Amino acid sequence: YSAVTADLQIQDVVNATSAEIINGDIQATHLQGRVKLETVNGDINLTNVAGELTVETVNGDISGHHTGTQDARFVTVNGDMQIKSKSALLRLESVNGKIDFSADNVTELDLTTVNGAVTGRVNLAENGDINGTSVGGKLDLTFDKDISARFDMQAHAGGSIVNKLSDKQASKAKYGPNKWLEFTIGSGSARVELSTVHGHIR
C-alpha cells in the first residue's frame, strides 16, 4: 500500500504487510508476518506488532512495542525513536535524532547514531553481541546486574568514556585525543563493542 498526503491505520493483519506513506502517519496494531513500514514527513506508531519488522522514517518519529522475537530494524533520519523490543536481532539507526529503547533477551544488537543520542536498557542473552557506534553523539546503555560480558570501548577525537559497571577507568593515548577501555564482567560470555568519534560512551 502506498499513498501521498494521507494517514494510514493498519490492524489485525496476519500475513505480510508493506506500506509507504508520504506526508502522513502510520498506526500499526496487531500485525504478524513480515512487516515493512515507511514514511516521509510522518510518524509511525506500533502496538503489539510481531513478525520480522522493518520501520523507516524521514522527518518523522517511531514509537511503540515490537512483541515478536524475529529480526527488527528501525531507522530514522531527522526523527526520534522510542522502542520496546523482544527481537533477538535488533538494529537501531538514527541520523539527527534520539533513540530511547529497551531490548529484552537480545542476541545481536547493532546501534548507529550520527549527531544524536542513544539511551537504552539491555537484557543481553548469554553469548550475545552488541556493536554500537556514534559520530558526534552519545551511547548511554544500562545493563542487568547479572550481565556477563567482555567490554571493548574506544573514543576518538576528544570523545569520553564513563564506566559504571566496574572500577576500571579509561586509558588515554599518549599522543592524540583517543581513549580506550577493556574489561570483563562475570565469565565474559557475551561481547560488547562500543566506539565514538567526538561523542560520549556511558
Where are these regions (language model features)?
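Intrinsically disordered, low-complexity terminal regions
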Residues: 1-202
